């Protein structure tokens, strides 16, 4: 009988669905394992083979953990609100709700065709009123706690999309060729900065890729420094700057303030006022990214005013430059051009003084020196001398001196800004707030607050949401009088901030999640998704989770204990898949051609899960041949005669090979090293064909190992061997440690690091026995004659090295 993957896969997918094989409930007597994918937004273009990689990895982990006796929660849902869904709807001329439902059906069909073991009874959709009523409820809790507030702020406005972008989104949109400008708008803002320290500190306990943790640390940007007051000549006030290098105060030769600084125009003298106003106007047209890029040309304008350096008493010119941001520190900096590259370039551009205050190995007039390892020079007055001190001591001494003189104070600052949360779009969760004529705000008392049914949902050019043009929804009256509903909607990130909790209890109409169920399932044991979400979704979700922890809605401080970022699968041309390049490989196409099991195995066999790798159609054909070889272990003849497998114990060599395979596949699957686990199963399959023993025990063991990876084929062969219960519910095989150990190991022998011979020995042989055998080797003896052995290094079961003199 030949393997018909299409017939087999449809058969088992239907049976899993009918028997609810993967439906999950709480089982306190079992250890739990919550494995989660970053759920997709259902775009109109459908899934390509790159999307399947992470989902396949999580499914293998889920199936493996079930076979190990865990109660596994492995759900799937749809992040369907927000800009991507709305853009697609506008492009196609259909309503977002219609396109979203159609796209979800398309995505779901593909995922089910892959045989993923999701518990579909827990499926969620962020646009479902039963879901977003709790998103709105969480927002109201944030508002109640003072963590959601309104503010007139300069925002990143995307001209083409007619939408506000979060700071974290700007770079991606600029890369797409879109225009982003700054403009003031009334916004809802979430006070994520109130949780900055906790977001930073709790990273240490997470099993996440270090690069992702570092990206979050950098984004939060905690720094310890000093706020220094510079007296402004002729203005009878102070200009406060923030610096992390108070030890370099003697080297400050000018000050720079941001174009948005409250004193920017006030500091302009009559002669400089026109130039200052022109510069400020130009700066407003630039994005933050354009202003702060390290490669950009440094621009600025002199205000005409001076401030007194508290350490030297010298007047310092006050400049305005767009590389300084009001949102960080005080919006004003002291510039020490000898020891900061940006300040050095600015000083060179405008002919400003450069004074060395940290001992440099070269001339600071010609090249900046930014090292902290040197000592302070040229830094003393009648009250204080920093000369000869290293950075930590100089920092402390200057900070204390400034505090004593009441000219400064220690300060902790963050790069992290509060999260601009509202969007001027239709397709998002309505913000459940009512505005009254006297300026008071009150929450909607009945949730969910639904979006109105409308025909025209395109964004406006004015910056107002389309909801502002629907008076019957916008205006109302209650016991407090007439009110106007909030017209901004939530961003696409809102629903994904807490979806992992709703999977635990998706049908609860009384609470976002039942406390007992949350306590059982949380936190997520394995979360798989792209690293591109490091400072967006992953940071936002951690923030909301901490708020919910404070509200006692959740019992854990963090949502995701282990994070794994899969590497990207490139097109066959080694480029990122995109429609513009024409190199997208649709998932449906390869599924129809090769089948789900082949796609699953191939994507995992391409290379380490975390690495970027190109798709190669020849490779998947090789995987198909491997599956056929497994099939022929049970159905060797095309005519349909099943193999007559022996119930006798395998031969000693095959038995040892089998236990080594179990050990290797188990360890690799546990550690997400799927490519090497598959390679090991290929070796074992070849061994089964080579020996021709026809051992039932060995073949069944192979199927149990293969089941998490190629579940359809494994189910079909398992049933063919007479098993009634699904292999998806069968326990993973155990290995015998003694049988899984090599009978002999090869010991390499080196003299001063150079290989001089080798020999075989039993694993775990005593050190003295190994040394004696090594010294007896002909190729080693001659290098030990007439020399003194200084050290004997023995690496058990691997290596001996003699250090001689």
From Swiss-Prot:
Motif residue range(s): 'HIGH' region: 40-51
Keywords, ordered alphabetically: Aminoacyl-tRNA synthetase, ATP-binding, Cytoplasm, Ligase, Nucleotide-binding, Protein biosynthesis
A Pfam cross-reference name: tRNA-synt_1
The EC number(s) this enzyme carries: 6.1.1.4
Coarse class of the protein's main subcellular location: cytoplasm
Gene3D superfamilies in the cross-refs: 3.10.20.590, HUPs, Isoleucyl-tRNA Synthetase, Domain 1, Valyl/Leucyl/Isoleucyl-tRNA synthetase, editing domain
Gene Ontology CC annotations of this record: cytosol
GO BP term, pick one: leucyl-tRNA aminoacylation
GO molecular function: aminoacyl-tRNA deacylase activity; ATP binding; leucine-tRNA ligase activity
Catalysis: reaction(s): tRNA(Leu) + L-leucine + ATP = L-leucyl-tRNA(Leu) + AMP + diphosphate
UniProt motif 'KMSKS' region: location: 576-580
Residues the entry annotates as binding ATP: 579
Annotated localization: Cytoplasm
Protein family membership: Belongs to the class-I aminoacyl-tRNA synthetase family.
Protein name: Leucine--tRNA ligase
């Amino acid at each position: 009988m030949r393997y018909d993957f299409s017939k087999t896969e449809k058969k088992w997918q239907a049976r899993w669905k009918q028997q609810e094989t993967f439906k999950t409930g709480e089982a306190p007597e079992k250890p739990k394992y919550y494995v989660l994918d970053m759920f997709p937004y259902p775009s109109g273009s459908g899934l390509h083979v790159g999307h399947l990689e992470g989902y396949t990895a999580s499914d293998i982990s889920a199936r493996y953990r079930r076979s190990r006796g865990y109660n596994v929660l492995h759900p799937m849902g749809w992040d369907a609100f927000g800009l991507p869904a709305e853009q697609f709807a506008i492009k196609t001329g259909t309503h977002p709700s219609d396109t979203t439902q159609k796209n979800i059906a398309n995505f779901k069909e593909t995922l089910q065709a892959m045989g993923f073991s999701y518990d579909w009874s827990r499926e969620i959709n962020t646009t479902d009123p039963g879901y977003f009523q709790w998103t709105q409820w969480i927002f109201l809790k944030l508002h109640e706690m003072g963590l959601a507030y309104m503010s007139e702020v300069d925002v990143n406005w995307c001209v083409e999309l007619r939408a506000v972008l979060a700071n974290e989104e700007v770079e991606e949109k600029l890369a797409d060729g879109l225009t982003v400008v700054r403009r003031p708008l009334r916004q809802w803002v979430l006070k994520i900065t109130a949780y900055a320290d906790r977001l930073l500190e709790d990273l240490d306990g997470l099993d996440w890729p270090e690069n992702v943790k570092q990206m979050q640390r950098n984004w939060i940007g905690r720094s310890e420094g000093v706020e220094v007051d510079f007296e402004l000549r002729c203005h009878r006030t102070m200009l406060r700057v923030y610096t992390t290098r108070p030890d370099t105060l003697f080297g400050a030769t000018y000050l720079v303030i941001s174009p948005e600084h409250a004193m920017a125009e006030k500091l302009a003298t009559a002669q400089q006022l026109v130039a200052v106003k022109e510069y400020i106007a130009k700066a407003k047209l630039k994005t933050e990214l354009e202003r702060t890029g390290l490669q950009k040309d440094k621009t600025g304008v002199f205000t005409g005013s001076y401030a007194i350096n508290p350490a030297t008493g010298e007047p310092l010119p006050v400049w305005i430059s767009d590389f300084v941001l009001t949102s960080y520190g005080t919006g004003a900096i002291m510039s020490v051009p000898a020891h900061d590259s940006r300040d050095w370039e600015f000083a060179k551009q405008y002919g400003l003084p450069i004074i060395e205050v940290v001992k440099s190995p070269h001339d600071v007039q010609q090249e900046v020196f930014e090292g902290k390892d040197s000592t302070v020079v040229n830094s003393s007055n009648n009250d204080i001398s920093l000369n000869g001190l290293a950075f930590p001591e100089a920092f402390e001494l200057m900070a204390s001196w400034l505090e004593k003189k009441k000219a400064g104070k220690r300060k902790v600052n963050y790069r992290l800004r509060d999260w601009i949360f509202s969007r001027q779009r239709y397709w998002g969760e309505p913000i459940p707030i009512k505005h009254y004529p006297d300026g008071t705000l009150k929450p909607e008392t009945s949730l969910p607050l639904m979006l109105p049914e409308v025909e025209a949902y395109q964004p406006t050019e004015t910056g107002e949401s389309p909801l502002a043009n629907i008076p019957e929804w916008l205006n109302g009256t209650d016991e407090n009088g007439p009110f106007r509903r909030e017209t901004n909607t939530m961003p696409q990130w809102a629903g994904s901030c807490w979806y992992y909790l709703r999977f635990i209890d998706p049908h609860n109409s009384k609470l976002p999640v039942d406390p007992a169920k949350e306590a059982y399932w949380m936190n997520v044991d394995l979360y798989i998704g792209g690293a591109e979400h490091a400072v967006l979704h992953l940071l936002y979700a951690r923030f909301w989770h901490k708020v919910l922890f404070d509200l006692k809605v959740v019992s854990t401080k963090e949502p995701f204990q282990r994070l794994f970022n899969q590497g990207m699968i490139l097109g066959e041309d080694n480029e990122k898949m995109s429609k513009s390049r024409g190199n997208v490989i649709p998932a449906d196409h390869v599924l129809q051609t090769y089948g789900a099991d082949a796609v699953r195995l191939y994507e995992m066999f391409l290379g380490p899960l975390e690495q970027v790798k190109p798709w190669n159609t020849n490779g998947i054909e090789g995987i198909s041949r491997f599956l056929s070889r497994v099939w022929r272990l049970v159905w060797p003849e095309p005519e349909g005669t099943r193999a007559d497998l022996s119930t006798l114990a395998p031969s000693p060599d095959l038995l040892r090979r089998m236990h080594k395979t179990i050990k290797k596949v188990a360890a690799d699957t546990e550690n997400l090293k799927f490519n090497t686990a598959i390679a090991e199963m290929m070796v074992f399959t070849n061994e089964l064909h080579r020996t021709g023993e026809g051992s039932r025990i060995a073949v069944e063991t192979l199927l149990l190992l293969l089941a998490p990876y190629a579940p359809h084929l494994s189910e079909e062969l398992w049933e063919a061997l007479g098993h009634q219960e699904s292999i998806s519910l069968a326990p993973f095989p155990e290995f015998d440690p003694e049988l899984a150990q090599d009978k002999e190991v090869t010991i390499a022998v080196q003299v001063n690091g150079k290989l001089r011979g080798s020999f075989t020995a039993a694993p775990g042989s005593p050190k003295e026995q190994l040394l004696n055998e090594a010294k007896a080797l002909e190729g080693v003896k001659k290098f030990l004659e007439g020399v003194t052995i200084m050290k004997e290094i023995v690496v058990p079961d691997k290596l001996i090295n003699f250090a001689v003199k």
